[in-house]
Amino acid sequence: MTAGSSPRCTPTGPAGRAGNERGFHAVAIDARSPRFDGGIATRLDSIPFGVVVNSHGRRFYDEGEEIWPKRYAIWGRNIAQQPGQIAYSIWDAKAAGLFLPPMYGPAQASSIAGLAVTLGIGGRAVADTIAGFNASIRPGGTFDPGRLDDCATAGLTPPKSHWARPIDTPPYYGIAMRPGITFTYMGVAVTAQARVLRTDGTAFANVFAAGEIMSGNILSTGYLAGFGLTIGTVWGRIAGAEAARQARDG
């Protein structure tokens, strides 16, 4: 599991490192999830279809900045930068069914203020935030959850660039979220043949790496859905072929 420390050695000695030591793939997960090994089922995909507020009841990032496969992996970091490393996803009845249902049921209330109290945050602050959000939505947009639509806010900071609709239809739903780190963007350094490099830049003869352990060679500042599988598949094939060649030829 990822414990937050960079890989520093292999069974045969110190390994070189590659990547961004402050970078990581982190998603928004249900705050009720287990600390370790909760799995992808604890990820929350409601964010684009509502608003996200921090413990002060204020929005802090554009929930509709880009399509979800390009943005879901930044929300863990976004939440980690908020007070207490916690945030709250809020949506209304119109958004129900637009995203994968959460593993644990959301809080539910007939009013925004009531929902905020249930979630343990200030009801007045959240109600004011939602009212300001609703009032800022540009009229005339055509909502389309399958593309970057033209439903956006105007004059609001931060904006919501797409999928902005008034949150005005009860019941209202909400879930507390925390950052869930999947893997870091720092890993062991490898050659183009997937051989692990030592700290002096020379390659181990019989140590190979593929997947997240060496993702720092490729990822540094961002992530697109499927990159992890791609890195594991492509580099796994390379590493397997090279390991077989090493075993055969010595």
Regions found by a protein language model. Give the residues of each.
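Glycine-rich loop(s) and the adjacent beta-strand/alpha-helix scaffold that form part
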Residues: 1-30, 194, 229, 238
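A conserved FAD-binding loop/helix module that cradles the flavin
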Residues: 1-7, 204, 214-248
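Phosphate/diphosphate-binding loops
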Residues: 35-72
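Short, small/polar residue-rich loop motifs at catalytic or cofactor-binding pockets
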Residues: 45-47, 182-184, 225
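Hydrophobic alpha-helical segments, especially N-terminal targeting/anchoring helices
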Residues: 53-54, 190, 197, 232
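Gly/Pro-rich active-site capping loops and adjacent beta-alpha segments
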Residues: 58-85, 198, 204-219
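N-terminal leader/propeptide and maturation segments of large enzyme subunits in energy/redox metabolism
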Residues: 88-144
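A glycine-rich dinucleotide-binding beta-alpha-beta segment and adjacent secondary-structure elements
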Residues: 125-217, 221
